Design a protein with these regions (language model features):
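Accessory alpha/beta interaction modules
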Residues: 1-157
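Generic amphipathic alpha-helical segments used as scaffolds and interaction surfaces in large
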Residues: 20-24, 165-169, 183-186
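Short, conserved beta-strand edge motifs with alternating hydrophobic and charged residues
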Residues: 125, 162-163
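Extended serine/threonine-enriched, polar tracts that run as long, contiguous segments within proteins
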Residues: 156, 163-174
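Short, charged alpha-helical interaction segments and adjacent helix-coil junctions
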Residues: 2-7, 69-77, 81-86, 172-257
């Protein structure tokens, strides 16, 4: 779990706020995506840190850590990427990835638009611990036919999970250097040195400090609201149970049970 009491000037790259700030620079995000996905990217639009999507006021929304699109020569979207720094195993991360895909797709298609207009979507979670418990450092998922895994569903959605504490188990050096930096905060490549320089710059920037304080207040408010909703739900459940118990007792007293 993230420690919100870490002094601002010591915030590491694994802090959600710091991660979003640093990876909102496309010169940081592009080589990272190319390295961990093994692809070449034509051009990235400026990444959007803490991008929020809400389909309607009553449905659950989503806030992406960093959301970015690859564009072609005419500015058209080729692929989209959601990059998440996830320090806590909430036991629901795979289902969160499913929800993120649904929210992203619902925002992408306008009413009446063809499904074929959906582009490749990569959802990337960077975690300290192995949330699947299978001992791997990298998990890559896509939809395949159960009886014949050579047949791909072709929905163009890919969900990858990178376990940075297991960086020593990663064969690909391009991926390992990033995971090692997330685990140790020690840069060992030109790309991670660029990240580290930005981290240190943000740690000393007063405007970023103010922005972080506002962000932390919003997080605290959201946590309090979620806690209140949980308390209200528990209270309603207890009240319903009390009414049911009372009704059952009445029936027993009347000899109908």
């Amino acid at each position: 779990m993230e420690n919100k009491h870490i002094p601002f000037e010591q915030l590491p790259i694994t802090n959600k706020f710091m991660f979003a700030m640093v990876f909102s620079h496309k010169e940081i995000a592009k080589p990272f995506l190319e390295a961990v996905l093994g692809i070449k990217i034509h051009e990235l639009r400026d990444p959007e840190p803490e991008k929020t999507i809400e389909v309607n006021p009553v449905s659950k929304g989503v806030r992406f850590d960093v959301f970015v699109k690859e564009t072609g020569t005419s500015g058209e979207t080729l692929r989209s990427f959601d990059i998440e720094m996830q320090m806590e195993d909430t036991k629901e991360i795979p289902k969160r990835a499913r929800f993120y895909q649904a929210m992203r797709d619902s925002e992408t298609l306008s009413k009446g638009e063809k499904y074929r207009n959906l582009k490749e979507l990569y959802i990337i979670f960077i975690c300290p611990d192995d949330i699947f418990g299978k001992g791997r450092a990298v998990y890559r998922f896509k939809n395949l036919e159960t009886d014949d895994p050579k047949i791909e569903m072709g929905d163009l959605c890919f969900k990858n999970f990178y376990i940075f504490k297991k960086y020593r188990d990663v064969a690909e050096k391009s991926i390992r250097t990033y995971l090692e930096y997330f685990a140790t905060s020690k840069p060992i490549s030109p790309e991670t040195e660029d990240i580290d320089r930005l981290v240190k710059w943000y740690q000393t920037d007063n405007n970023t400090r103010i922005r972080y304080m506002t962000w932390q207040e919003e997080i605290d408010i959201a946590v309090d609201q979620e806690r209140q909703r949980a308390d209200d739900a528990e209270k309603r459940a207890n009240e319903e149970k009390a009414r049911a118990d009372k009704y059952e007792k009445m029936l027993r007293d009347l000899g109908k049970l």
